[in-house]
């Protein structure tokens, strides 16, 4: 009895400590969402964000006037995303989490690192069809895939919906998809993604959302894994989700390969 009570107390204290650490950042995000419901402020903020974008790889985020930003569902989503980011096990320079996913076309369970091919970098692109920034930048991601397919491999990991139609709904989402109740729901949603990026490797997270949790991927996020270690960790979406950073990393990696080959030839 005493041991059980001690375990419960430890869990309660751990949860309380987590809440205290996340609270300042969460309150700041909540205030920002509240301010964004004033359309004059929303337009100014989006305009400033658009000015900071790095060309066609990162088109600006669009938020229609009809979308409510400060709601109970939005606060839940923000808290959930911040909690996943804080508790994630993926960190720059460390071993990449080898979580279970399912291949969409083959309907077969694999682990993320099974998709690596030798020493080639593996790019992980986490997102969902109900996430407007992710879908808006999907074309740019495909351009990167086609331009760097000779030196790297790419994997789209379909996670839980960012803006489900029965949650924090967004009228800017190209698809209105409810929360996934089973793996079949997630596979059906991923088929829509596959139609958007034909020929791409698409997998789905399991219903425990283990990949999403391990990589802190909600709402969307980019990672690069090489030699089973995280060598690039993108920021949390939407603000930190930048295809331009992915392109820059791959360009530097390609230049490094060319320089090493040139050095070998000179020797």
UniProtKB/Swiss-Prot annotation:
InterPro entries listed in its UniProt record: Iodothyronine_deiodinase, Iodothyronine_deiodinase_AS, Iodothyronine_deiodinase_I/III
Similarity annotation: Belongs to the iodothyronine deiodinase family.
Biological function: Plays a crucial role in the metabolism of thyroid hormones (TH) and has specific roles in TH activation and inactivation by deiodination. Catalyzes the deiodination of L-thyroxine (T4) to 3,3',5'-triiodothyronine (rT3), 3,5,3'-triiodothyronine (T3) to 3,3'-diiodothyronine (3,3'-T2), 3,5-diiodothyronine (3,5-T2) to 3-monoiodothyronine (3-T1), rT3 to 3',5'-diiodothyronine (3',5'-T2) and 3,3'-T2 to 3'-monoiodothyronine (3'-T1) via inner-ring deiodination (IRD). Catalyzes the deiodination of 3-T1 to L-thyronine (T0) via outer-ring deiodination (ORD).
Topological domain ranges for the Cytoplasmic compartment: 1-15
UniProt-listed Enzyme Commission number(s): 1.21.99.3
Top-level taxon in the UniProt lineage: Eukaryota
One GO BP: hormone biosynthetic process
Main location: membrane
UniProt membrane topology term: Single-pass type II membrane protein
Name of protein: Thyroxine 5-deiodinase
Database matches in Gene3D superfamilies: Glutaredoxin
Annotated GO MF terms: thyroxine 5'-deiodinase activity; thyroxine 5-deiodinase activity
Compartment(s) where it occurs, according to its Swiss-Prot or TrEMBL record: Cell membrane; Endosome membrane
Residues of the active site: 131
Alphabetically ordered keywords of this record: Cell membrane, Endosome, Membrane, Oxidoreductase, Selenocysteine, Signal-anchor, Thyroid hormones biosynthesis, Transmembrane, Transmembrane helix
GO cellular component: endosome membrane; plasma membrane
Complexes and interactors: Monomer. Homodimer. May undergo minor heretodimerization with DIO1 and DIO2.
PROSITE patterns: T4_DEIODINASE (PS01205)
Pfam families named among the record's database cross-references: T4_deiodinase (PF00837)
